[in-house]
From Swiss-Prot:
Homology family: Belongs to the cytochrome b family. PetD subfamily.
Annotated HAMAP family: Cytb6_f_subIV
Organism: Chlorella vulgaris (Green alga)
A single MF term (Gene Ontology): ubiquinol-cytochrome-c reductase activity
Predominant location category: plastid
Residues that span the membrane, as ranges: 36-56, 95-115, 131-151
GO biological process: mitochondrial electron transport, ubiquinol to cytochrome c; photosynthetic electron transport chain
Function noted in UniProt: Component of the cytochrome b6-f complex, which mediates electron transfer between photosystem II (PSII) and photosystem I (PSI), cyclic electron flow around PSI, and state transitions.
UniProt xrefs under CDD domains: cytochrome_b_C
Entry's localization field: Plastid, Chloroplast thylakoid membrane
Name by which UniProt lists this protein: Cytochrome b6-f complex subunit 4
Gene of this entry: petD
InterPro entries named in the record: Cyt_b/b6_C, Cyt_b/b6_C_sf, Cyt_b6/f_cplx_suIV, Cytochrome_b_C_euk/bac
Length: 160
């Protein structure tokens, strides 16, 4: 049996909070024990059951065994390493390529410090973070597509 606290709408404190858009956590069903003991385990076990069921019903194929005597002409990494592979392929100096790869997470770590004074969560009111995200996404897609192309057109994607 759940214990719920019904809202007292004649309470002036609650009415003031509701007028400001607050107060939704002031009343309602408590998280303990209802959510934590009953709902969360059902969701967790249901997720595990779905994942295990899908892995049993449709296992992923591993593919052909590798032949060390028949190497392909161009060896490409997995798709999620394409932007990093393209950076290493395009930059003439390998040390500079490694430094550029290290600059990506270092630049992402500086974004919260740049916008530390900004209290908004809306992306349109956080111009620095939104700009860094958009430029980074476009650059990663550009480098990822270029890594799958031949080296002579990989930087321009054959467009220019």
């Amino acid at each position: 049996m759940a214990v719920t606290k019904k809202p007292d709408l004649s309470d002036p404190v609650l009415r003031a909070k509701l007028a400001k858009g607050m107060g939704h956590n002031y009343y309602g069903e408590p998280a303990w024990p209802n959510d934590l003991l009953y709902i969360f385990p059902v969701v967790i076990f249901g997720t595990f059951a779905c994942v295990i069921g899908l892995s049993v019903l449709d296992p992923a194929a591993i593919g052909e065994p590798a032949n060390p005597f028949a190497t392909p002409l161009e060896i490409l990494p997995e798709w999620y390493f394409y932007p990093v592979f393209q950076i290493l392929r395009v930059v003439p100096n390998k040390l500079l390529g490694v430094l550029l790869m290290a600059a990506v997470p270092a630049g992402l770590l500086t974004v919260p410090f740049i916008e530390n004074i900004n209290k908004f969560q809306n992306p349109f009111r956080r111009p620095v973070a939104t700009t860094v995200f958009l430029i980074g996404t476009v650059a990663a897609i550009w480098l990822g597509i270029g890594a799958a192309l031949p080296i002579d057109i990989s930087l321009t994607l054959g467009l220019f």
